[in-house]
Amino acid sequence: MSTFAAPIYAEANREHLLAEFARLRTLLTGDQAPGAGPLPWDCDQPPAADILTAIFDLSPFERDLLLLCAAVEMEADLGELCGRLTGRPQRNSPTFGLALSLMPNPDWRALAPASPLRYFRLVELEPGFGLAAAPLRIDERILHFLAGSNRMDARLQSILRFEPPTAPLAEDHQELLDSLLRDCDARPETISLHLHGDDPAAQRAIAARIAQHFDRHLLILRAENAPAAGADLEQFLALWSREALLLPAFLLLDWHGDAPIANLRALAERIPTTLLIASRDAEKLHRLTWRHEVNCPDPTAQRRMWQSALAAVVPAKILESNAQLDTALDRMAEQFRMSADTIATVAAAVANEPDSLAERLWQNCRAVSRPQLDLLAERISPRAAWDDLVLPDAETAVLKMLVSQARNRMTVYEHWGFASRGRRGLGMSALFSGPSGTGKTLAAEVLAAELDLDLYRIDLSAVVSKFIGETEKNLKKVFDAAEQGGVVMLFDEAEALFGKRSEVRDSHDRYANIEVGYLLQRMEQFQGVAILTTNTKASLDKAFQRRLRFSVDFPYPGAAERERIWRRAIPSQTPSSGIDPARLAQLHMTGGNIRNIALNAAFLAAETGQPLSMSHLREAANLEAAKTERPIAATETRGWE
C-alpha cells in the first residue's frame, strides 16, 4: 500500500533524492564542498529520506551511509566510483571503511549489531569480509521506500494480509471497542490485547478499528503461518519490526487455526511491537496481554442487526408489506450465528429480490454456513419426507416435537425469557438408537428437510484418535466450522466414543471421559441441531444420555411396518407385475435392507426388459442376505414366485 502516490510528491521526492546523490558524489570525489543549507522542499509531506531518518532515528552519518548504498543501486557511475575508491572495481559497492574515510561525522557504532542499520536490516554486509572491508548493499524494501513506494516487504506478503476497518460492528462490540480505545489511549505504549470467543469476524473488525484509531494499518498473521522457532522466527521478527514502522501497522495473530502453541508463544513473547491476538479459546500466550471476550451477538441482538442491515438496502415500503419477514427474521436470528459483516453482506445480496425476500435470505444464510464444514463432513441433500419414515407413533411424535421446538426457539428463549439465565443446555441435541437400517439417517434427513437446513454426516469412528487429546481437537474443528449454526449435524457410530464409563485407571480413560464431555458441551451450545446415532444404546452411559435433549428409539420393524416400507420402496411409475406387499413383509429385514432389495430387483428387471416381479425381488433378497450374512428361512419368501 503506497503512501507516496501523488504525482507531485513523487516528482519532488525524485529530485530531492537526486540532489542527495549529487551531494554524496562531491564527498566521494572531493571536487567541491557539500552545500551548507537544507535542500529546498515545497510538499506537505517530508521527503522519503527524511521520513526514513525519523522512523529509525538515524544519525547524519548513518543517513549518509544508507543513501550512499541507495545511490550506487540507482546511479551506475557512483557504483563504479566506489569500486575504484575501494580498489575493487568489479564489485561497485561502497564499504564501511570508505564511508568512514570520506564522509563527515564518521562513527564506528553505525554498523554495530544493535544499530538501526543492522538491527532493522536496512543494509546488508557481504559475508566473508571484515566489518570495514565488507561490501554494503541496501535492502530492496528500503530502496523502494526511498524511491517513493511504500509496499509491504515481498517476504511477508505470502503470510500477512491487510484487514480494512470497514466491517460493521454489533452494538455490544461497538461498546467494547469504545472501552478498549479509552484503555489504549491511557496506556498507548503497552497495547497487547487478546480477543477471544466465537466471533472471529468481530475480533478482526475490532482490531482493525483499534489500528485505525492510532493511524495504523492492521495486518493479519494466521496461526498456521506463524514461523517456527529458529532462523524463520528471527527473520520474521526482524522484517516485521521494520514493517510495523514503515507502513505503519499493528499485527493481529489470528489463532483460529491449528498451529503448535510453542511457536505462537515464542512469537508472542518476543515480538517487540504492538500485538493483538484473536482466538476462540482464552489460553494465554503472552503474560502482558489484556484479555476480552468477543462472542457472536445473542439472537435478540442478531435480529436487530438483520433489521438494520435490511433497512439500509431495502425500501421501507417493501419491508413493511412483507408478512413473512418477521417470522423469517426470528428463525434466522435463532438458527444462525453470524457476524455483523456477514449479515450486511447477505442483506445486500438479496436487496434486489423483494418478492422472495424471506426465502432468499434463508437460502443465503444456509450457503454462507457451508464452506468450512464441507471440508470436514459429508453433506447429504435431504429429500425424505414424513411419509418415508415408518416408526411407531410415539417415536414420530418426539421427532415432530424436536422440529416444533427448533422452529419456535426465538419465541420461547428470547421473547419469553427462557434464555435469560444462560444458554447452557438449550441446544437441540438428540440420540437416535436402533439396529442398522431402521431409519436413523432417514429421520435426520426428514428433520433437515422440515427445517430447511443442510444435513452433514460425521463418522465418529473416524474422528476418534488413539492419541491423547487428538479426538478433542478433531471435534473442535468440526464444531468450529459449523459455528454459524445453519445445519443438522449427524454424528454416526456414537459408541466409538461413548463407551460405558468405568473407573479411571490411566490417562487414556481420563481423556476419553474428557472427550465425551467436550462433545456433549459443544452439542448443548450448538445453534443448529446435533444428533448422535448408535446401534447399541445399552453401550452408552446413562449419565451421558441424560444430557441429550431428545431420545428416539428406532425399533426393528414388525410385519405391518415392513409392509408400509415395501409400499414406499417401489415408486408408482415402476412397471411391475404381481407385487404383493403383504407377502414381501414376511421377510424379516430392516427398512434399509428393504430399500436395497427393491433397488437391486429393479435393475434385474431392467436388464431382462421385464416388469418388476416377485421373482426379481426374491433374487435380490438372496443377494442382500448373502451380503449381510443372514440366512433367509423358507417361510419368509414363500409365495414369491
PLM feature segments, named:
Residues 1-313, 323, 331, 624, ...:
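Intrinsically disordered, low-complexity N-terminal extensions of AAA+/P-loop NTPases
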Residues 360-363, 367-368, 372, 382-384, ...:
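AAA+ P-loop ATPase central domain
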Residues 320-336, 345-346, 380-384, 498-500, ...:
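Short conserved motifs of the RecA-like P-loop NTPase core
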Residues 161-178, 381-411, 588:
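Dynamic helix-loop-helix/coil hinge segments at AAA+ ATPase domain boundaries and subdomain interfaces
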Residues 74-75, 334-363, 367, 586-615, ...:
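AAA+ ATPase "lid" subdomain C-terminal helix
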Residues 174-322, 396-400, 404-584:
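Walker A/P-loop NTP-binding motif of AAA+ ATPase domains
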Residues 371, 375-379, 391:
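Long, low-complexity segments enriched in small/aliphatic residues
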